[in-house]
Amino acid sequence: FRVPIITCFFYFKSQFKSRIKIFLYYNCMSAAKISVAKKAIDYIEKKLSIETVLGIGTGSTVNYFINELDAYKNLFRGAVSSSEASSQLLREKNIEVFSLNDVNQIDFYIDGADEVSPNNFLIKGGGGAHTREKIVAAAAQEFICIVDKTKMVDKLGAFPLPVEVIPEARSSVARKIVALGGKPIYRENFITDQGNHIIDVEEIDISEPEALEILLNNIPGVVDNGIFAFNKPEVVLVSD
C-alpha cells in the first residue's frame, strides 16, 4: 500500500501550520506575561527598601516576575514564598527566602490567577499552591495580582475550582461537593507541598464567591479552596 505523494504533502503542510500556530500562541502568551511582570516591577520599584520583604506566589506568570526581579534584588531584604517551586527559583537568583514565621511584615504579595472577576475575586490553585498562597496573601500589606488579559472574566467558574483535601477525606469531600452541584475530579499523580490531594471542581455555581468559599472550607477534610474572595487583591495588573 503506497500513500500518494500529494496526500503526504497536504498532511505535512497541515501539521506544519498547526505547529506554527501553537508556537505563535505560546510566544504571544510569553510576551504578555513578560509585559505584566514588568508592570509589577514598575509598580513596586520606587517603594522598595532594604527592609522590604516581598511575598511571592506561584505559577508561570510569577516565574517571569522572579526573572525580572533579579535585577532589583539588592533593593530589598528578601521574600516569603508560597511554594517550593518558587523558593527554588528565588534561590537560583540569590534572593533570600524567609519563612513566614521569621518576618514581621510582608509589604507586597505578587501572584497570578486562573480567573479574575470584575470585583477582583479570584480563582487560583491551578498549580496546587493556593493554600499557602492564601496564607501569604493574608499576611501582606498589599496584594498585587498579575495576569494576562485572557484571565479576566465576567463570572468565575469556567476554570475548575481546586480544593485541597486531607488524603483520607478525599472521597467524603467529593460526595459533599456532588451534593452542592459540583463535579469533583481527583487530580491524579499530584501531591501538594503540604502532602495533601487536590480535587478540581467543575460545574459548581460561583455566583456568590464569598458564601461558597466559606461553605467549602467548612467541609471536614478540606484544607482550603481556590476562591480568593476574602483575600482578594487590592491591585490587578493586566498585560497589554
Protein language model features and the residues they cover:
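Cationic, low-complexity basic patches in intrinsically disordered or flexible, solvent-exposed regions
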Residues: 14-18
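Conserved phosphate- and dinucleotide-binding cores of soluble alpha/beta proteins
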Residues: 31-34, 46, 84-240
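Short helix-loop-beta connector
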Residues: 44-52
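Short active-site oxyanion
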Residues: 51-54, 72-79, 121
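Glycine-rich beta-strand-to-loop/alpha-helix junction loops that act as flexible
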Residues: 53-61
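Active-site histidine-anchored catalytic micro-motif
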Residues: 67-75, 83-92
